[in-house]
Amino acid sequence: MSFQEKNITVSLANFLLILGIYLFRVVQMILDGSFNATNVFRLWGIVIVLAIFVTVFATILTHVIASIIQAIKTKAEPLVESIQDERDRLIDLRGTKITYTFSSLGVFLSMLTFTLGQPPLVMFTLLIFFGVVAHIVGDIFRLLLYRRGF
């Protein structure tokens, strides 16, 4: 697995975990009747902190563990290929395009709920939801392009 594929896989796993936590907490707030601005904005903070710190920590940990395993197997220092060639840049560009497309669609749907009479809190909750989903879809698309060989 290439350096870029490892990064994408770790990011995908982290954002799937974050999406699960986010959906669990939103459903829990709705069922408890505690779906208010304070709780939703606190959840936003948790999601943002998780997205930043867990992704960075998990990426570093994954590369360290993969390097240790490779060093044990080959009895040599592992070669880290973090150089991006044109293919990697094109895959990243196409993945970013898909991410932005899904994000834009999510913003449109979120705004549509507001115009259809839903409270602004629903719109803000959907904005974060669609942002995370867009990132997941973009990562899946990037992985598919790497697996397909572009």
Residue ranges and their predicted role:
Residues 1-31, 140-150:
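Cytosolic-side membrane-entry/anchor segment at the start of a transmembrane helix
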Residues 15-22, 51-59, 104-107, 111, ...:
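Helical transmembrane-bundle signal
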Residues 33-41, 114-124:
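Helix-coil boundary and interhelical linker segments in multi-pass alpha-helical membrane proteins
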Residues 41-61, 129-133:
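Alpha-helical transmembrane segments
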Residues 57-77:
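Membrane-water interface of transmembrane alpha-helices
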Residues 77-99:
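Short membrane-interface loop/juxtamembrane segments of multi-pass integral membrane proteins
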Residues 98-120:
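Alpha-helical transmembrane segments and their membrane-interface junctions
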Residues 118-150:
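C-terminal or internal capping secondary-structure element at the end of a domain, subdomain, or sheet
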